[in-house]
């Protein structure tokens, strides 16, 4: 929040000075880097504010992205209304506050969280603009943004003006590069306004794409990705075993027994100390099996793995006396 406060103060007060300061930092970063790893500077001969109106927050799941989003809305509204802003910002009115999500389930989740926070919000309705547009947050799935209006889609150019655009998991859809459909939509929506993006996995999204890497290198204001989140004592302990087929076949039973014993240990610890865990919001332990397929039709390998796990559990629950 403090970084956002400093950035918005400088962005609204003197965008030219902010651009110059960022370019100085890029120069320092590039000093000891090979050319292939250097970051392109911002264009100091072009309009400054339009190169600075996109911020991103790289934050691990569970680290408070939603709470930060709520605070960012209030911060932006505060600085937009300041009377001593630079002339390019002075007196500008907010057209809409838009939250883009990847799916309807997440839209509904955000709606509930806005309600709990006391922030006016609604699911976007293309057939009518509410009286509180610009004050109420309008939530819309990014998949419904198209070039032209349709039965279940809305044209991007319907959102003209000074919009504040919030994007949850902004990297989704960036696989097409900087010219991908999603990035074009994001850029169009905040062309005369501002955008905040929030994601846990920017690194995976930009991997292998020099253009996206350069873009987000200049727009990520805060990096609290999982390595830092975990290093501060949050998140889950995990271990990844990459087993080839032969090793897995030979040791699957041993591996599942070890997992079962670990799960029992966690359950027992929780049962005996539940009252002590309650202040930390720790829930009852859960054992999850994750397959590689997310489609309705499971791949043969996934189906086979699931059957093996179910057979193991069936043997366990039907053999309480320990007989083979």
Task: Give the residues covered by each predicted segment.
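Signature of the SF2 helicase/ATPase Hel1-core->accessory helical subdomain module
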Residues: 69-80, 139, 143-271, 287
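Short hydrophobic/aromatic beta-strand immediately N-terminal to the Walker A/P-loop
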Residues: 56-58, 98, 288
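Inter-Walker segment of RecA-like/P-loop motor cores
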Residues: 117-150
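Walker A/P-loop NTP-binding motif
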Residues: 3-9, 66-90
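Conserved C-terminal RecA-like helicase domain
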Residues: 48, 91, 131-136, 270-324
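Conserved pre-motif I regulatory segment
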Residues: 1-58
